[in-house]
Amino acid sequence: MSEPDDVDTVKERLAEDRQNIHIQNEYQDISYTIIKARIGMLATAIGGPDHSVDSVNPPYKVGDDCLACIKDLIRWFKLVDDNQKRWDVEMATAEFKILQNDLIPILLDWEAKNSAATRKSKKTGEDISIFFPNKSYHDRIALGALQLMVLMTWPLIITDQSSYNQVNYYFELKKHQLLYKHAILTTENGKVLKAAIRLALNVMSVDVDHRTARDDSLIRMVLNFLKNVVAIEPGEVTISSVKRLKRPLTMAEMLPTNITVDDISINSVITAFDKNKVFGFLLTVASSLSDAVDPNFVSWPLLEVMFFLTKDINPIRLFKNQRKSYKLGTDHEITDSNMTTSGKHLSELLAKEHEKKLNVIKNTSSRHSRFGGLLSIQTPQNTRLTIASNSVNMRDDAALQELDSRKKWNKTITMRLDVIEGLSSSFFSTEGNSIYMSSDNITSIKEFLADFVDSSFNLLLQNATDSFTSEIQDQLPLHKIEYMLFISWFVKFQRSRCIYEIDATPDYVSGALLDECYILFTKYLRESYEQKNWPVVHAGMLLFTEYLEFLLSLDQSWEADVQAVISKILSENMLQLLASLPKSATSHSSQYVKACINLTHVVLKTIDKFDENSSLTVESKRKRKVNLNHTAIEKYAKDNDLDYESAFDILEEQFKQVTINFDKVFRGYLTEPTISTYIRYLQSYKELEDKDLIRVLKFFQRVFVKAKEELFLFRIDFMILCREILSQQGLPTTSELRTHFTKFNEYYLKQLKNKLKKMPSLYINILFPMLHDSQISYYMRHGKMKLTEGTPDIVLPSTFINIPDEGSLPKKVLLDMQVGILVSSLIDDGYEDLIEALLLNLQSSFDGLKGKVAEGINSLEEERVKKVAFNATNSEIKRALYQQPEFRRLLILAGFAIPEANQPACYFINNKTPTEVQLVIETIQKHRSLPFESEIGKPASYYLSSHYQEYEDPEEYGSDLNNGSYFEDLEIMDKRTEGRELSKGKAQSKLVQRSKGKRKAIAHHPEENESDFEANASSSTKLPVVSKEYIMDSDDEDPDFGAIFFENETYLRQLLDKHNGSLTETQFSLFAQFCEERVKNNGQLRNDYSALFNETPKSPIFSDVDAETIIIGSASLPSLANEPIETQVVSSEEYSSHPLEEEVTSEQRKRKKPRIESDTEY
């Protein structure tokens, strides 16, 4: 198709899309018009003013079909708004003012009649229905009106899944809901609230056993109504992962006409609640969650009421009335103690104007110097920069700023970046100190909250946590946010209360210290971070901060509980997550960044407190192999009066814990993104409080002074920021905080000058981001290049242990077994490439030796003197020459000299004949396809023991890292096997199934004491325990039978290998007699079977095996079951003196090696 045709096709598609959108909009308009007409008819039929009464304000009279109309409206809400994700019905009901003109009058009339009838009934003792005719019908109308009010006042929230219709109606409906709230709070002083409470009390007066689910739902509906009234506010409520920066809506744009902020503020809500006894109703419901009401119905709506009632209040202000003064150039001082919200905003604007006026006066010359000024600067290129301004005569920096302002820059193309907002400001007030509340309301709300905490907080939190953990489906993000911020606020409230009130105690919020609580919110924090659900992450950080602050504020009587809780919530995985939060906070909103910095400060303060005596132990993130000695468990159980299983669980838990080291935890925060987050936060220093600035400065001191990571702060943006902070327009000159910044800046510049003298290249480095190349980074830190040719850390080769009757086996049979063990172990660990590299080098050496045979003996002897270096094709193989113990032992068996401290090279020793080299090659190739099999089902690693010269406990918390990053995973096995398919690794499939977790098979180290060594060996050789439920008669037989059986299997495998996997009928018959005779005679032989084992083998691997070494008689038969297993650990000194020693004699083992307990002894 030609190009014009493509253009026409695109234009046609665009036209069709525009037409479809237009048709869809027309359809939506028609749909809304139809719905609006139906709602209008229902609104007319509900009722209206009774004009038959001669009165200026006629009473409201319900229509004949009032109840049916209300039910129809409820059905419309569910049919359209709920099921179709539209707000057409809500918009239509708002335009007809159904709530103000119909629902509120209905509830007020019902409340007045019901109250009067109740008083008369109490006086006369007669039934209330006598004084309130047709009461049940009117009760149903009132109940329907309240249900419809709940639907109309339900908080509107925009999420990523909101439809176009909902976004289009959002701001208009928000204004209508603000009108609803104003009408509810002000109509007859909020008597609608009393009517709603009366509906709930009528149900609560019925005995719990006689209530129905409908009755409990009514109580929940009343709580939802109270929650909606408190939650309606002019702020935009959005829960979105990404929100673009835009011009914020002013307060005038968000508010409807003739409504002020004070009319719907929290102060007005508290006034209405106090007058209509809402606080008493909430305390009644909260304190009777397990008695008078069903917690499954009311616990969550009650928690939401408390959350929205307190989220905009600063808890500290309830106990310490902070009076911020505003200097407006007058003789008197204005404070915010008795100032409305509007007056507060006006005072702030006047204060800013006064400050700017003083700044202008300070930077303007006097009338005697207003005669002009001229400054001309000659550049090295013989050009001149001239400035004519009065400001150049006052300060040098003013002249430079004038020059910069006159520069002509090329217009750069900037991309519009998404700024992640995190938690909406509607969920936590950023102006908590400036919200107006009268002194009477402060007293009322403080008394109510204190009573709630003393009587109901722990009970409500426990029920809410149980409901969260019992539900299978995941909770909504909104519910997670409300749950975490609810705990955060009341924990902070009680912490402040304990400071200002003597009789207050932390016991009343101790429910937050329960395992279920902190496990739940740490789970929400971790999962939300992985899912990039930033609002929930933001709420989790606020809770985590207050949680740690609360724990640190507890006295010595809580020390055990604090230790237990902190050791669980600050696990290694959680510390890693907390360190990653400020890394990703650069692109987030300022409030999100503030939460990150506050959390980081509290975490570091917590760890620093416990680091003084190294008393904080946390759960390790690594899976540790627990080897507990039977004797140690029994001793611990006896000393602590415990049973065996309890003692084992306690000791096992201790194995899973590690001690926190502050320096290694802080190392996780030493990253460039984290530093950038702090610098960006400090750039708005004029808007930050003193405590926030102190926290940022303290973090920089940790980085620059304590950690000596100066390179992170040697950057041009930080230098410019320090200069701006300490300028005349920066921090106030009389501020104590300025003194701290000045001292830090002096030390900073001193270190910078020293570094610049030592490394002139730093002049270039400070202009650009850090380079993460290891060589450059090392040079910038230490001022010298890193030695690239240095010898890596050297580990000792593995030694063989647990090999039965090792001393009596023929040399070549033992060599075959040892090579099989090493090859199978390497295959299991994913080191197939190491075996391949070894075979290539052996084949190269074999070809060289084979080619010299024809040249004569002299040439061959001359060739043997030469050292053939091992050819390592990549860095992994080269590192394995130094640090892989199994591979180093296999090199020795193959005839290589392995690298040592005094001999860093690896080379082939030409002291073997071509036949011997060929034998080694074929043995390795055989075990690649036919892995080693143990008679007792043990893996190949069971027969190996690794040694380390510079041993560090692999389970120690935060092992040292070469790159300086504490939280990087150093599990070598995972790195080498990740993403690798072990196509030829058949050894694993032949063995008993093992754990798929990370291998940590360090069996023993010279630094361990003998008891630990015996415990490890004992547990590693322990046979599985047989349950009594499955004990058969065979378990009572001779234990030697199993050993003889496995020995016969070994001899059969040797025969099969010897004859290439096939035996004749005569050989099978003879071998059957051989096995039967050994079984009958307890392993002893009466006849001669040399004819069976002394035939010439067909495989070249066993071509040189002597006949006398193969003949199996009663004297040479090994006994695998009764001999104790012994091994020897060779020290680094002994190994250095004998680098080529391949085995240790049994006499040396008996002399130097402590005996390991056998299975039967255990």
From Swiss-Prot:
Composition skew (Basic residues), residue ranges: 993-1003
Q: Which residues form a coiled coil?
A: none
A Gene Ontology molecular function term for this protein is: DNA binding
UniProt key word Repeat: no
* Principal location class: nucleus
Which keywords does UniProt give here? Answer: Cell cycle, DNA damage, DNA repair, DNA replication inhibitor, Meiosis, Nucleus
Spans annotated as Disordered: 977-1017, 1127-1162
A single GO cellular-component term on record = replication fork protection complex
Pfam families under this entry?
Answer: TIMELESS (PF04821)
Any GO BP annotation: meiotic cell cycle
Asked whether the keyword Nucleus is assigned, the reply is: yes
Where does this polypeptide localize?
Nucleus
Annotated family = Belongs to the timeless family.
Q: What does this protein do?
A: Forms a fork protection complex (FPC) with CSM3 and which is required for chromosome segregation during meiosis and DNA damage repair. FPC coordinates leading and lagging strand synthesis and moves with the replication fork. FPC stabilizes replication forks in a configuration that is recognized by replication checkpoint sensors.
State whether it acts alone or in a complex, and with which partners, per the record. Component of the fork protection complex (FPC) consisting of TOF1 and CSM3.
Query: Per its UniProt record, what PANTHER family does this chain match?
Result: PROTEIN TIMELESS HOMOLOG, TIMEOUT/TIMELESS-2
User: Which protein, by its recorded name, is this?
Assistant: Topoisomerase 1-associated factor 1
User: Gene name on record?
Assistant: TOF1
